[in-house]
Curated annotation (Swiss-Prot):
Residues 17-27 have a biased composition (Basic residues). The gene is REX4. It is found in: Nucleus. Keywords: Exonuclease, Hydrolase, Nuclease, Nucleus, rRNA processing. PANTHER family: RNA EXONUCLEASE 4, RNA EXONUCLEASE REXO1 / RECO3 FAMILY MEMBER-RELATED. This is RNA exonuclease 4. It comes from Candida glabrata (strain ATCC 2001 / BCRC 20586 / JCM 3761 / NBRC 0622 / NRRL Y-65 / CBS 138) (Yeast).
Length: 263
């Protein structure tokens, strides 16, 4: 991980590959995991927990109660063959998913400035979740979609501090994101392409869900995870967790495609 040239100038951001399967008489339909029933498979554990939190967020919104996503996923998925184990689920690990939230700056708030960045590990547990003070004057908080208010800036870190923290954590890690290039540009950071997994650029997803274009994270979460996200105010923690789950749902395909490209 290194600072981009732009930042330097400023110093004077599980399903396996589908093979041929026996066709059952009844089509298999993935249903949203209910809250009154524990998930039957390990991969659904994290989705189960996230759906509980999303539903709780909706209930709290109705009564005007503030809600934040938990830092730890209680239902841990360890089905993947990685060096991480259930015991190590809170460690940073090899894989990091990132998502950012932005506020509006400039005339009519049309330009975007970083205001929050969240990182989760392979198991969806929060590694970092910080609010960032925009360097420009905020002209539109975009609270209705970003969930960010002026109050969040009371304990926010400076852009430079956020950048340094991200740089330190992401060093030598595999970064998973959705249209992650934009987040890195907002942070004025670069990351080796060989260590970046972008769910928005995965060809099978583009072909299946977006007619060759880049599918939205919301679309992928609904189609692949049967999970409704971004229904109101966004949460970068929620989005980072969804991104990691989407990667894990087709991890073998992602990794195979990645090896072909960089090895």
């Amino acid at each position: 991980m290194r600072l981009s040239s732009n930042w330097s100038k400023l110093q004077d951001g599980v399903t396996k590959k589908a093979g041929k399967k026996r066709i059952d008489k009844k089509p298999h339909i993935i249903k949203k995991v209910g809250q009154d029933k524990k998930p039957k498979s390990k991969i659904m554990g994290m989705i189960y927990q996230m759906n509980k939190e999303i539903d709780q967020q909706k209930e709290n919104k109705k009564v005007g109660k503030k809600f934040e996503f938990t830092e730890t996923i209680t239902e841990i998925d360890t089905v993947e063959t990685t060096t991480e184990t259930k015991k190590d689920a809170n460690k940073i690990g090899k894989y990091i998913a990132m998502d950012c939230e932005f506020v509006g700056v400039g005339p009519e708030g049309k330009d975007s400035a970083l205001a929050r960045v969240s990182l989760v590990n392979f198991h969806g547990n929060v590694v970092l979740d910080i609010f960032v003070k925009p360097r420009e004057t905020v002209t539109d908080w975009r609270t209705w979609v970003s969930g960010i208010t002026p109050d969040h800036m009371k304990n926010a870190v400076s852009f430079k501090q956020a950048q340094q923290q991200l740089s330190d954590i992401l060093k030598d890690k595999i970064l998973v994101g959705h249209a992650v290039k934009h987040d890195l540009e907002a942070l004025m950071l670069s990351h080796p392409k060989s260590k970046v997994i972008d769910t928005a650029r995965h060809l099978p997803f583009r072909q299946k869900y977006a007619k060759g274009k880049s599918p939205s994270l919301k679309k992928l979460a609904k189609e692949i995870l049967n999970m409704d996200i971004q229904s109101g105010q966004h949460s970068s923690v929620e989005d980072a967790r969804a991104t990691m789950l989407i990667y894990k749902s087709a991890k073998q395909d992602f990794d195979k495609e990645h090896r072909k490209k960089f090895h």
